[in-house]
Amino acid sequence: MQRLPIEQYSALLAEKQQKLTALLAPFNSPPLDVFASETSHFRMRAEFRIWHEQDDFYHIMFDQKTKQRFRIDQFPIASQLINQMMLALLPLLKQHNILTHRLFQIDYLSTLSNKIIVSLLYHKTLNEEWLQAATQLKQQLIKQGFDVQIIGRANKQKICLQQDFVDEILPVKNQQYIYRQVENSFTQPNATVNCKMLEWAINCTKNSQGDLLELYCGNGNFSIALAQNFRKVLATEIAKPSVSAAQFNIAANKIDNLHIIRMSAEDFTQAMNGVRAFNRLKGINLQDYQCNTIFVDPPRSGLDMATVKLVQNYERILYISCNPYTLCENLQELTKTHRIEKAALFDQFPYTEHMESGVWLIKKSN
């Protein structure tokens, strides 16, 4: 892997700050709160293709521009734990032919709490012999001091040697939050910047009256940290593994005012507007909630127009965006009814064009 341009980090971040400031200028945004990343070892997950060459094999990546493959032995943007595991894993895999045969990818998911999942992906069916060798591999890694989960994946097959999750512990505002992270589900990749995002969101919403609604809550990353600022929190999520992780996280963090329902933002919009009833909402009276704050963290495509209209009904809007261009499209509508009170840049992905941002909007008085 090429050396990281660490000495350029501040200049690259300043460039992003200028770009986002310019994008938000038409909406009368206040100056940005800027949250920097660690300059190396900041990424908690990584995926590598495996290249086989005669008796050898190694991690590779592809150059996005030239599509050329290049060998990776160390990966300075990934956590120290992932780098340690990369060095330890390959020599051990080489001891077991059954583990290397038709292996085409390795995924790593690590935590600040020093746990790691290694997923081995194959172009073949995994059998009992594979399971025995993988169990031996896991024991060898535990002997080296790793707190590791091993998962084997193949077409329509997933074998967990113990479990397919790790429990992360995030320090946020003098509190420790437990988050179950499930393999192959979305988690924030930059843990220290995620902590800064949570702190910023808590600061925005402190002294809130009433209840919070969150759309697209994932494993409860934001709603769990924000629950302290509200009477009640109602959150929606569509992916089953994320919903069950969120339910675990609610219990683990002893949160008693947060309810998660498994439905899409679009369906929830229909339910809120009384367009149709949903079985999934049985036992939940939407009238019991006085949600005057809404939190959205949509996919790269931003909010669809129906959800923008729904969001505009709320007094306060907290919007976390992974795509400033779709954020600005949404702001063209949202700023007709709301003003930007605070805006932030979170450098989740250093040394890339990617910009994670947040805006805190308050309804304009008529």
Curated annotation (Swiss-Prot):
The keyword Protein biosynthesis does not apply. S-adenosyl-L-methionine binds at Q188, Y216, N221, E237, D297. One of its GO terms (cellular component) is cytosol. PROSITE patterns: SAM_MT_RNA_M5U, TRMA_1, TRMA_2. Belongs to the class I-like SAM-binding methyltransferase superfamily. RNA M5U methyltransferase family. TrmA subfamily. This is tRNA/tmRNA (uracil-C(5))-methyltransferase. The active site is at C322 (nucleophile), E356 (proton acceptor). Dual-specificity methyltransferase that catalyzes the formation of 5-methyluridine at position 54 (m5U54) in all tRNAs, and that of position 341 (m5U341) in tmRNA (transfer-mRNA). NCBIfam families: trmA_only (TIGR02143). Pfam families: tRNA_U5-meth_tr. It catalyses: uridine(54) in tRNA + S-adenosyl-L-methionine = 5-methyluridine(54) in tRNA + S-adenosyl-L-homocysteine + H(+); uridine(341) in tmRNA + S-adenosyl-L-methionine = 5-methyluridine(341) in tmRNA + S-adenosyl-L-homocysteine + H(+). One of its GO terms (molecular function) is rRNA binding. Keywords: Methyltransferase, S-adenosyl-L-methionine, Transferase, tRNA processing. GO terms for biological process: tRNA methylation. The keyword Glycoprotein does not apply.
